[in-house]
Amino acid sequence: MSQRTEHNGSWLRNAGSLLSVLACVAVLASPASATPASAAAAAAPRTDDYLKRAERILKFTPLIDGHNDLPNFIRKTTKNQIYEGKIPFEDELPGHTDLKRLRKGRVGGQFWSVYTPCPDPPVPIDNPTWSVRDTLEQIDVTKRLIEKYSRDLQFCGDARCARRAFRRGKIASFLGIEGGHQIGNSLGDLRRVYELGVRYITVTHNCDNAFATAQSTVADGLPDTGLMKPFGIEFVKEMNRLGMLVDLSHVSANTMRDTLKVARAPVIFSHSSAYAVSNHLRNVPDDVLKEVAKNNGVVMVTFVSRFVNVENPDAADINTVVDHIFHIAKVAGWDHVGIGGDYDGTVYLPKGLEDVSKYPHLIARVLERGATTQQVRKLVGENILRVWTEVERIAKRLQKTELPNEAYWEGRNWTRPAKRDLNADFEGRSVPLFTSASNGDFCD
């Protein structure tokens, strides 16, 4: 064999070896030969992918939050003065909510809470307070804020308006009252605030009233007497007749149960979570969740750290809230869960949900946990809109056969005497204007 032939044969042998090595490398690099772990990692969607999915859903489905306390923030910080730059709503406010962050959070609709606190110290139910006056002021400032920023916000009083506003690129804005004390325990005042645009009333806040027992009463070790009878029942009936959403956040467990027995329309929990996940009395027990499903209502999950993780509020994070969402969906069904953050109503929020800009991140986590697009659409807005539409439909039917309810609290004093004697000088004689016979019961 010549030197050249030997050299060529050596080259061919080396080339064949090189090709064999390259073939092995190609086989090892192919998907079929990849390890299960590496294949799963390559196929698994990234967090960014879930966030993009969440953004797409919120582009076509309005995210409607059940409870935001921005009006109370305005009351406390500016005494309800919103003009001349006192509330730069288009910029970043110190609290949790402003236009910039609402837009970033893809908010499509918001129930603004026109909250005023329970009397402190507590007073007898029939004692006069400033609660009704303060409530009217909160309605006023909220409507003025909506009007001032009408390029971005639209005041709405029904579910159809909410959808129209969303299609126009505006944030639909609704009003909710947080406690029966705010209407003076009066069905007449209930009707008046409905006329002003209020569309839900929380039956109690953190105080009992003439309608029902609050969870705070039970937390103080007092009996859970539930819905007051008969006046509380008449209150619920009149709310149903009006088309006012009955909100059961803040009420005691027996008030929840009693109300669900007598309600003629779906109820809501505007900002409550699951008691089985975190056993705080502000949350909803499983037996009540099952009744909410039968009632066709909705529980809108709140974010308050001490409610969603009663054992260790500091450890609460975005996944804790997802736990509550999935528990309610498991017990009541995906048709009966929503979102009610309680922004600007607390200073204690879970990590990852620090302000209203974080909703897409929450929805991304819900998708990552395994929820379908349709389930998420129900969660963010379709459920509360369905409930509201049904409440309106039932109200129209009831109004055809029922007159406004004239019930009143049995303990009410209808002839409240003046606190001081006002004397009038009549023909030179001092004559008592209010006598024991009249008891001050006239209005000349």
Swiss-Prot record:
Cysteines engaged in disulfide bonds, as pairs: 118-207
Reactions catalysed, as given in the entry: an L-aminoacyl-L-amino acid + H2O = 2 an L-alpha-amino acid
Binding positions for substrate per the UniProt entry: 205, 282, 342
Glycosylation sites: 413
Classification via Gene3D superfamilies: Metal-dependent hydrolases
UniProt: Zn(2+) 1 binding residues: 67, 69, 178
Top-level taxon in the UniProt lineage: Eukaryota
Any one Pfam family match given in the protein's UniProt record, by short name: Peptidase_M19
Cofactor(s) needed for function: Zn(2+)
Signal sequence residues: 1-34
GO biological process: proteolysis
This protein's record includes keyword Metal-binding: yes
Residues at which Zn(2+) 2 binds: 178, 250, 271
GO molecular function, one term: metal ion binding
EC number: 3.4.13.19
PROSITE patterns the UniProt entry points to: RENAL_DIPEPTIDASE_1 (PS00869), RENAL_DIPEPTIDASE_2 (PS51365)
Keywords: Dipeptidase, Disulfide bond, Glycoprotein, Hydrolase, Metal-binding, Metalloprotease, Protease, Signal, Zinc
Functional summary from the UniProt entry: Hydrolyzes a wide range of dipeptides.
Family indicated by similarity: Belongs to the metallo-dependent hydrolases superfamily. Peptidase M19 family.
Protein name (Swiss-Prot/TrEMBL): Putative dipeptidase CPC735_015490
Organism of this sequence: Coccidioides posadasii (strain C735)
Organism lineage string: Eukaryota, Fungi, Dikarya, Ascomycota, Pezizomycotina
